[in-house]
């Protein structure tokens, strides 16, 4: 999407492009990969990189695969031990930065001895020498990394977990009664800092009774029953944002581009969604749309704004508009793909 150009994964003449499967674990097509979507193949510095485990030899190990830009000459360059599920990956300043989560514990013979040991953390791989760095882990029920951000040899990441006194049974019972209220009352949201050079993990803050913590440009944005707030990771101070949400519900996630914070609110007694951008504590209304035509911002990458919306045929779709169109209040998305009902 950055260049607007297609790239070749496989340039083999007459290749059938067979995929990876349990019966075909070594496909001849160099474009075949296997793993979670959050850790897909990335073209970076004229090489293809992929984080995953294509051999399934050990469910607690993942690898960094490096190959030519067309997928040929694939090799394992780094090993991530005690990493079960890679959930997100960034490539910055010749580093591979990723988040992972674990659930099970194995003994030395590879047998499961505990199927409920949730933990999560981040890893960093130096592409100059393939050295692996690992942060401290967070633990307790539903421990997970929700966002990662890199700047100047430091990784910031947001976490979510239940308090240490919350058991799996309590979560099941709470979810059956009122899952949203139970999560609001018992979930802990944290922001951590990992210094690569010092190999040091620091918890900057951990907050309870909030909604949807987002790590935007390294700072933590969130809402609660008291309003909207931002936690500055440099000063470690929290301040309230001048967003009037009385009688309104947030529609979609908060997003940032440059100095602007983008947000949308739907009024409880209206079928409209209003879109805003905030800068220097001043909000500007961008557009109003009916709830049937409304969209959520999935991400903002440069001048491209990726959105999810329902098309005229009632299908949930991923599309793109320009940042200039968003700022002018124009919503005429280019449809990229539509999702099936089971997706």
Protein language model annotation of sequence segments:
Residues 53-58, 101-117, 160-186:
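Short, conserved, GDST-rich strand-edge loop motifs in beta-rich repeat architectures
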Residues 298-343:
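Blade-level signature of beta-propeller repeat domains, shared across WD40, Kelch, NHL, RCC1
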Residues 20-22, 28-42, 82-93, 141-152, ...:
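Repeated scaffold domains used in trafficking and secretory/extracellular systems
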Residues 2-4, 68-72, 126-130, 195-199, ...:
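Short loop/turn segments that connect beta-strands within beta-propeller blades
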Residues 49-52, 97-100, 156-159, 221-223, ...:
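Residue position within the beta-strands of beta-propeller blades
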Residues 7-9, 15-32, 73-79, 131-138, ...:
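A short beta-strand motif characteristic of beta-propeller blades
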Residues 1-74:
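Post-signal peptide N-terminal segment of secreted/secretory-pathway proteins
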Residues 63-65, 121-123, 190-192, 227-229, ...:
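A short loop-to-beta-strand structural motif that recurs across blades of beta-propeller domains
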């Amino acid at each position: 999407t950055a260049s607007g150009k297609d790239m070749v994964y496989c340039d083999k003449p007459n290749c059938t492009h067979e995929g990876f499967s349990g019966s075909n674990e070594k496909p001849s097509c160099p474009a075949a990969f296997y793993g979670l979507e959050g850790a897909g193949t990335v073209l970076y510095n004229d090489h293809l990189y992929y984080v995953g485990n294509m051999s399934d030899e050990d469910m607690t190990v993942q690898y960094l695969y490096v190959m030519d830009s067309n997928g040929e000459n694939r090799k394992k360059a780094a090993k991530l031990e005690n990493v079960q599920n890679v959930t997100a990956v960034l490539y910055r300043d010749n580093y591979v930065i990723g988040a992972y989560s674990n659930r099970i514990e194995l003994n030395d013979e590879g047998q499961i001895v505990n199927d409920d040991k949730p933990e999560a953390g981040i890893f960093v791989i130096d592409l100059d020498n393939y050295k692996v760095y690992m942060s401290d882990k967070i633990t307790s029920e539903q421990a997970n990394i929700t966002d990662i951000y890199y700047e100047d040899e430091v990784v910031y990441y947001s976490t979510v977990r239940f308090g240490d006194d919350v058991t799996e049974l309590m979560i099941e019972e709470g979810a059956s009664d009122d899952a949203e209220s139970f999560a609001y009352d018992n979930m802990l949201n944290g922001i951590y800092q990992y210094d690569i050079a010092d190999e040091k993990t620091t918890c900057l803050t951990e907050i309870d009774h909030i909604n949807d913590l987002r790590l935007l440009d390294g700072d933590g944005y969130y809402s609660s029953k008291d309003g909207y707030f931002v936690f500055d990771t440099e000063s470690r101070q929290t301040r309230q944002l001048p967003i009037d949400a009385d009688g309104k519900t947030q529609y979609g996630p908060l997003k940032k581009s440059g100095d602007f914070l983008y947000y949308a609110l739907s009024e409880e007694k209206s079928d409209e969604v209003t879109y805003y951008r905030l800068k220097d504590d001043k909000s500007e209304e961008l557009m109003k749309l009916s709830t049937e035509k409304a969209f959520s911002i999935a991400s903002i990458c440069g001048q491209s704004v990726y959105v999810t919306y329902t098309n005229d045929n009632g299908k949930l779709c991923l599309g793109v508009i320009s940042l200039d169109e968003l700022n002018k209040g124009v919503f005429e998305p280019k449809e990229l793909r539509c999702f099936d009902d089971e997706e």
